[in-house]
């Protein structure tokens, strides 16, 4: 079984919690850590932006990535949310077993 971390940024903590709860309830992710304040610097519509955001760090099975991506896009307020999948090469056997049990 392959596992991954999915990162996603949101406009605030409330949106991150809303998305995380929905994904956990749907059994698409086992867990989401929410980092409440990060600073993102980027260009959007030819304008340099510097915004405070939240970072969601989600753990799941790699095979569920497409479903997670669809769900995030459905729930998210951004036009183009950051949705990045990072493979987990190694991890605690017990923890990854728990991730497996918590997801569909």
For the regions a protein language model found, what residue spans apply to each?
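Positively charged, small/polar-rich N-terminal and surface patches that mediate targeting and assembly
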Residues: 1-104
């Amino acid at each position: 079984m392959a596992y991954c971390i999915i990162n996603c940024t949101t406009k605030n903590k409330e949106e991150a919690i809303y998305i995380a709860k929905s994904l956990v309830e749907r059994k698409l992710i086992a867990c989401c850590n929410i980092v409440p304040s990060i600073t993102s610097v980027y260009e959007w519509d030819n304008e340099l932006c510097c915004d405070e955001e939240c970072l969601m760090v989600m753990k799941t099975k790699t095979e569920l990535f497409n479903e997670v991506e669809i769900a995030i896009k459905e729930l998210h307020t951004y036009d183009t949310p950051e949705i990045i999948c990072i493979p987990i090469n190694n991890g605690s056997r017990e923890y990854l077993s728990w991730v497996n049990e918590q997801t569909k």
